[in-house]
């Protein structure tokens, strides 16, 4: 396993017959069974691989609007040993119930909370899971409908890096969370119940890094192939950090490039007007532009490796055209068959 589970528990928030939300609290933690280990390992892997996560910190009431400190206060008591895990998670469930009650769309769910260790850091994982209906075949070959937790499609989840939170009170990225789809802030209530305030604009930092890399290779005496190698190396490094759940470190990245004969990136990035943090989370979708060009519009979707620009793919900005040399075989076959049909 990639995680070492300390404790885990599930509470339920559901509507009663009058439509009021109620908490059903579990009186003791889940047993460390194989089922629990498999569930948390799957959730850990699924969550870590989610791209486009937001990052924040526990807000201070007044300085950060109406940030509710109740969750962080209870967590602090739990970490100090003044509050048990069951009591802490029970208080958290009540806080979530109160927050959910403010919205008409909520029907509740199963609140999973787990403390575990991974990569020498302590984490608190918090997720509101829903049940999903499925069909199974019984021993007598009859169909039966049952419900199971939908682990592969988590939309309301956050993970608190407890080690970073307690070691660096000025950090603004020790809480990560899944953003709502298509930019909608459907998860606002989930952040509000924890008193979480967004602190680091991950996409902006990754976009700035990409711009710094492009400016760096443009100002260097590298050949075209070496420039693309530099872009690929940056993407490779950042992808590895993303997969490990670790931050991009500008100094570390610069050392990686220096090992490839591309010196002085650190001074270039820090000396310009890029305003890059020393460390920030990776966003794979943004940095993928270092390796690929892609775009969609007007019913046309185009994607190609960056190394093909100027060779197999020629761009003419004056005529606003792309010339593709060597049409992919499967596309060529479709086009040829369409022309024959006409």
Swiss-Prot record:
Subcellular localization(s) per the UniProt record: Cytoplasm, Nucleoid
Q: Which GO terms describe its molecular function?
A: double-stranded DNA binding; single-stranded RNA binding
Q: Which InterPro entries match?
A: Nucleoid_associated_NdpA
A GO CC annotation given for this chain: cytoplasm
> Per the annotation, which location comes first and is thus the protein's main one?
cytoplasm
Regarding protein family, the annotation reads: Belongs to the YejK family.
Output this protein's name. Nucleoid-associated protein Shewana3_2426
């Amino acid at each position: 396993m990639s995680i070492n589970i300390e404790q885990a528990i599930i509470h339920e928030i559901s509507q009663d017959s009058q439509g009021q939300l109620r908490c059903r609290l579990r009186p003791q933690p889940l047993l460390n069974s194989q089922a629990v280990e498999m569930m948390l390992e799957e959730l850990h892997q699924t969550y870590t691989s989610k791209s486009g996560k937001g990052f924040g910190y526990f807000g201070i009431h007044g300085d950060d609007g109406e940030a509710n400190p109740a969750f962080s206060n209870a967590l602090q008591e739990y970490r100090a040993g003044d509050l048990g895990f069951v009591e802490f998670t029970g208080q958290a469930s009540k806080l979530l119930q109160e927050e959910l009650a403010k919205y008409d769309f909520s029907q509740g769910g199963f609140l999973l909370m787990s403390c575990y260790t991974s990569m020498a850091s302590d984490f608190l994982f918090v997720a509101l899971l829903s049940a999903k209906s499925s069909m199974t075949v019984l021993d007598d070959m009859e169909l039966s409908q049952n419900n199971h937790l939908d682990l592969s499609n988590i939309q309301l989840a956050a993970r608190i890096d407890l080690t970073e939170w307690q070691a660096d009170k000025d950090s603004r990225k020790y809480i990560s969370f899944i953003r709502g789809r298509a930019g909608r802030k459907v998860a606002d209530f989930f952040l509000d119940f924890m008193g979480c305030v967004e602190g680091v604009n991950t996409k902006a930092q990754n976009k700035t890094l990409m711009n710094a890399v492009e400016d760096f290779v443009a100002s260097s005496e590298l050949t075209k192939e070496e420039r693309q190698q530099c872009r690929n190396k940056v993407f490779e490094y950042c992808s590895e950090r993303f997969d490990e759940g670790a931050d991009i470190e500008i100094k570390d990245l610069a050392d990686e490039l220096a090992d490839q004969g591309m010196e002085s990136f650190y001074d270039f990035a820090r000396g310009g007007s890029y305003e890059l943090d020393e460390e920030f989370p990776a966003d794979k979708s943004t940095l993928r532009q270092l390796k690929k060009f892609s775009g969609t519009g007007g019913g046309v979707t185009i994607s190609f490796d960056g190394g093909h620009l100027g060779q197999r793919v020629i761009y003419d900005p004056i005529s606003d055209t792309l010339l593709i040399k060597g049409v992919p075989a499967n596309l060529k076959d479709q086009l040829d068959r369409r022309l024959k049909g006409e």
